[in-house]
Amino acid sequence: MLMHTVLFKPRPGLSDGDRHALEAALVSALSGIPAIRGFRLGRRVKHGAGYEASMREDLEFAAFVEFDDLDSLKIYLQHPAHQELGSRFMAATAAGFIYDYQMVDRSNLGGLLEGPRVKPSGGTGS
């Protein structure tokens, strides 16, 4: 399973209209791209842990998009609904990080740590 991980901070002064347009683009992508296996969106919780002060960026939101495999992720990245979402996302954010991770459950930890990495087979995107 692959997890497309997006950490971000909205642009200061982002209008309600721009927020709604971003949300509409997200809903369109989630409902229109069958390659998406799962999705979660969350807001950062600050609770006084020491590591909070060491973060260089205060990225308020995290989105996690789950895919079965690399081919599914590539389908998502190339889909017109993702292109629209990506365009709106880039215009709406002040800062962000986007990473893709190969995920395993606890019964497969050794396999991930010892096994080969998923190798990219062309193309990039968010």
Report the location of each language-model feature.
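Short, solvent-exposed loop/turn segments at secondary-structure boundaries
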Residues: G17-D18, Y51-A53, L77-Q78
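Generic detector of contiguous secondary-structure segments
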Residues: D16-S31, D105
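Short coil/turn motifs at secondary-structure junctions
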Residues: R11-G13, R44, D68-L70
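Hydrophobic/anchoring residues in structured secondary elements
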Residues: G38-L41, Q78
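Short, conserved charged micro-motifs
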Residues: G13-H20, S72-I75
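Glycine-rich beta-strand-turn "strand-cap" elements at beta-sheet edges
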Residues: G42-E57, S87-S126
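An amphipathic, aromatic/His-enriched active-site/gating alpha helix that lines ligand/cofactor pockets
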Residues: A25, G32-P34, R56-E60, E66-Y99
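Active-site-flanking beta-strand signature of metal-NTP-handling nucleotidyl enzymes
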Residues: L2-P10
